[in-house]
Design a protein with these regions (language model features):
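Unusually extended, aromatic-enriched hydrophobic runs near protein termini
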Residues: 25-31, 60, 128-137
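Alpha-helical oligomerization segments
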Residues: 109-137
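Short terminal alpha-helical segments
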Residues: 1-42, 46
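Short, charge-rich, low-complexity alpha-helical interaction segments
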Residues: 41-66
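Amphipathic protein-protein interaction modules
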Residues: 57-118
């Protein structure tokens, strides 16, 4: 039997979401006023970070199965900030604290500093409607 390859792995989702977060942070930095798009951008960043945070354990499961505990723990520690920043950003959005949103988005941009996005990317605008989705949760 041949191996079954899952094209939608957690690692690929994390890479795609990381690029989308970088794009959203750049767009959020361009915003001059707090409109619906700014709310969508901030909500999308929070939701995407939460999704990344939730996928860390499944990424690490294969390493733990092979007893690579140090590598697994290092990976967890490397991505621990994602869930924390997602929660802080969510609280800042719900309390309309846009100064904190700006500060957190700058910190998030620093975390994703090494990610390069091509000019002709195919990411689109994944943040459209994210605020409604965040409020609905």
């Amino acid at each position: 039997l041949s191996r079954i390859i899952n094209p939608d792995s957690v690692g690929k989702d994390r890479a795609r979401l990381s690029k989308a977060i970088v794009l959203a942070v750049r767009e959020l930095a361009k915003q001059t006023e707090v409109g619906q798009e700014a709310k969508d951008l901030a909500a999308f960043i929070s939701l995407a970070l939460k999704t990344i945070s939730e996928g860390i354990d499944s990424s690490v499961a294969a390493w733990e199965k092979r007893d690579y505990w140090v590598k697994a723990d290092r990976f967890r520690m490397e991505w621990m900030w994602a869930g924390q920043y997602a929660d802080k950003l969510k609280v800042a959005i719900f309390t309309n604290d846009w100064g904190s949103v700006a500060m957190l988005s700058a910190q998030i941009a620093q975390k994703f500093g090494k990610i390069v996005i091509a000019q002709n990317h195919r990411l689109g605008k994944p943040w459209v409607g994210a605020h409604r989705q965040l409020v609905g949760k």
